[in-house]
Amino acid sequence: MGDVAAKIKIMPESIETDLAELKEKIKAVIPAKADLHGDIVEEPIAFGLKALIVTLIVNDEEGGTEPAEEAFAKVSGVENVQVLEAYRI
């Protein structure tokens, strides 16, 4: 088995959500079997709302990004979690 790079979009609950604090919360819940690749990037959406883009390297095993998606979804201030891309490296 190899590794997979996954780009995940995390939508905050509102424009008022403190993105710096949310980034720290996201970093704190990254599962042990996943590694953060690069920085967490802010992506403008509309009307001042910004999404966070997280790139993770995970092992290509059953479940893949699910543990990370579930952990991110449980973070206070997160509205939605979506895998944008996933590919073998």
Swiss-Prot record:
One of its GO terms (molecular function) is translation elongation factor activity. It holds the Pfam family EF1_GNE. Coiled coil: none annotated. The keyword Repeat does not apply. It comes from the Archaea. The keyword Zinc-finger does not apply. SUPFAM superfamilies: eEF-1beta-like. Keywords: Elongation factor, Protein biosynthesis. Belongs to the EF-1-beta/EF-1-delta family. Promotes the exchange of GDP for GTP in EF-1-alpha/GDP, thus allowing the regeneration of EF-1-alpha/GTP that could then be used to form the ternary complex EF-1-alpha/GTP/AAtRNA. HAMAP family: EF1_beta (MF_00043). NCBIfam families: aEF-1_beta, PRK00435.1. This is Elongation factor 1-beta. The lineage of its organism: Archaea, Methanobacteriati, Methanobacteriota, Stenosarchaea group, Methanomicrobia.
